[in-house]
């Protein structure tokens, strides 16, 4: 009984936060941010990064032991992001929402590959519309080919 109460208290106190970073990419940005997270000994629950035309987009979901720890963490992350020229947005995630996300882990996934010399917005709109019309959600979009030079028009 006492273990259940203490476990519930720990779950009540901890916070889960999505940190979304964006800005010009250059070496050591991710390392610099991860060093701040490491100083606060948070758990990394999810991470994703993409760089498009030298612009970084990085998302990190962290678990912090308490609201007080989260406040200090967010302050330090905000200052570090500012120091290295990135914008950061903090989004709280409820335990219910996190558990729901985790429970979707075993769901079927599909890969759609679009082949063309040059991809147009019209083509991508058609494919994404078909995906949405079938009740599916897009988890990621990736260009698999080399970069498209403009002189090949």
Pin down the residues of each PLM region.
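A conserved regulatory-domain signal marking ACT and ACT-like small-molecule sensing domains
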Residues: 8-153
